[in-house]
Design a protein with these regions (language model features):
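ATP-dependent carboxylate/acyl-activation modules
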Residues: 1-42, 53, 130-138, 146
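Cofactor-cradling patches in redox/metallo enzymes
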Residues: 25-131
Length: 146
């Protein structure tokens, strides 16, 4: 077993754009931390390039975006910026108020999963663990094929 696979999943929990309502993201971040994950929690109002930079610096497995208003519409641009930075294997989840038409847009852009209000915290934790394992596997494969 590699050293990387023994480390707990690492997730960045953030809010992009002008949405400052952070109660939900704080609850999720605390639950994930209590579940043994390494959580990097940012203040609200992050921009796309700041999130990409932080994901690179932190060597995160998953990025969790919280959205109460329409700031989830920035996520397709985040996905593009991640691909341009060579981080196309980054697993991204979105949680919050996301209308069905926007959910399709996010999934089509490469978001791994969308969680709606009332989603079970345990289910979010399971998804983050699975997505972290997937991200690590994709990174290993990328290294081995170079």
């Amino acid at each position: 077993m590699s050293k990387l696979s023994k480390q707990p999943p690492k997730i960045i929990v953030t809010k992009m754009g002008f949405d400052g309502h952070d109660r939900g993201s704080r609850v999720v971040a605390a639950y994930l931390r209590d579940a043994g994950m390494e959580v990097v929690y940012t203040p609200p109002w992050q921009d796309i390039h700041g999130v990409v930079k932080l994901a690179t610096e932190e060597d995160a497995d998953v990025i969790g975006i919280s959205s109460l208003a329409t700031d989830h519409l920035l996520v397709p641009k985040l996905m593009q910026a991640l691909r341009e930075a060579g981080m196309g294997d980054m697993q991204v989840i979105v949680g919050g108020i996301v209308p069905p038409k926007d959910e399709k847009l996010l999934l089509d852009a490469g978001v791994a999963q969308v969680f709606h209000p009332g989603a079970a915290l345990e289910g979010i934790a399971v998804a983050v663990r699975e997505l972290a394992a997937k991200a690590r596997s994709l990174r290993r494969d990328k290294i081995l094929t170079k």
